[in-house]
Curated annotation (Swiss-Prot):
Coiled coil: none annotated. One of its GO terms (biological process) is tRNA wobble guanine modification. Pathway: tRNA modification; tRNA-queuosine biosynthesis. Keywords: Cytoplasm, Queuosine biosynthesis, S-adenosyl-L-methionine, Transferase. It comes from Saccharophagus degradans (strain 2-40 / ATCC 43961 / DSM 17024). This is S-adenosylmethionine:tRNA ribosyltransferase-isomerase. It is found in: Cytoplasm.
Length: 350
């Protein structure tokens, strides 16, 4: 399977660089996985696509203002993008600088906080913050929202609210679980009133989510690792939902990766730790019956995940139609509602 199999042409003007006026103001492309049929809707129409007893699973991670600026004690300027909170005083981070800092060197942040570079772990740097503060406090005070590269603008005050789900409670992500950005409190209440169950998992989205697949043969791709948690309570809800003949609906590919990681032994079980699950065509889904997701970058692992869910041909056709109908793409863009194609795992890509 080649990386280029997942390529498509996207006009630059279809990349959404700002959110819609309201969270639910996006369009919704419905893809029936088994048949490939498409229907053009508005996001609030999701209420009519779910049924009483269905279980919607959301990722409750919260984006931290992970981008900060500073300089080395020697004077050279640099940019830090936190990747993972290790503990109250330590983070793993990407450091952009003309010359990489060495272990033991001091970085002075824009508010005067002095941070020590402790060690290098391949492309990431371990940074230690002073004992009289916490890494999260410093980031919350002076950090910028880590907007994706393709948004191609500086973050603004509005992004602190809109590049964040309304239900995110667990701080630690450096990228938003973007399917969740479309939900507001009113829609969540309407779903609940309809009898749709809601459950929450946690996956702290890392900057690696934007890393391109660089190898031609996708089987040679090394997937990035992210921290996740699926509780016993969520597992019990999933089992009860399945037993009642209802659907498990994942909100976002991060929720998919959580649930499918937790079910690697065939049955969903509590899980806390790292996941580097790579889902591509041929994968047999074990938990997820339907998916709410945004449109993903060409040749990305997330487009491969969707292709494995709905079928390669159905997915690529849906993307062609979305381009033709001028849907808005990527993090601040429009969404899809997709039902699972159980035959997708048998599909050959030629």
């Amino acid at each position: 399977m080649r990386r280029q199999d997942f390529s498509y042409e996207l006009p630059d003007e279809l990349i959404a660089r700002r959110p819609t006026e309201t969270r639910t103001g996006s369009r919704l492309l419905m893809l029936d996985g088994p048949s490939g049929e498409l229907a053009h809707k508005q996001f609030p129409d999701l209420l009519n696509l779910v049924e009483e007893g269905d279980l919607m699973v959301f990722n409750n991670t919260r984006v931290i203002p992970a981008r900060v600026f500073g300089q080395k004690a020697s004077g050279g300027k640099l940019e830090i993008l936190a990747e993972r909170i290790l503990d109250a005083h330590s983070i793993l981070a990407h450091v952009r600088s003309s010359k990489a800092p060495k272990p033991g060197s001091i970085i002075i942040l824009q508010d005067g906080t002095e941070v020590e570079m402790v060690a290098r772990h391949e492309a990431l740097f371990e940074l230690r913050f002073p004992a009289d503060t916490t890494a999260l406090d410093v980031l919350e005070n002076i950090g910028h929202m880590p907007l994706p590269p393709y948004i191609d603008r500086e973050d603004e005050a509005d992004d602190k609210e809109r590049y964040q789900t309304v239900y995110g409670t667990q701080k630690g992500a450096v990228a938003a679980p973007t399917a969740g950005l479309h939900f507001d409190d009113v829609l969540l209440a309407k779903l609940k009133d309809k009898g749709v169950q809601q459950a929450f998992v946690t996956l702290h989205v890392g900057a690696g989510t934007f890393q391109p697949v660089r190898v031609d043969n996708i089987f040679e791709h090394h997937m990035h690792s992210e921290v996740m948690h699926v509780s016993q309570e969520v597992c019990d809800l999933i089992k009860a939902t399945k037993a009642a003949g209802k659907r498990v609906i994942a909100v976002g590919t991060t929720s998919v990766r959580c649930l499918e990681t937790a079910a690697q032994n065939g049955v969903v079980e509590p899980y806390q730790g790292d996941t580097d699950i790579f889902i591509y065509p041929g994968y047999q889904y074990k938990v997820v019956d339907a998916l709410v997701t945004n449109f993903h970058l060409p040749e990305s692992t997330l487009l491969m995940l969707v292709s494995a869910f709905a079928g390669y041909k159905h997915t690529m056709n849906a993307y062609q139609q979305a381009v033709a109908q001028c849907y808005r793409f990527f993090s601040y863009g429009d969404a899809m509602f997709i039902t699972h194609n159980a035959e997708a795992c048998k599909e050959e890509i030629k």
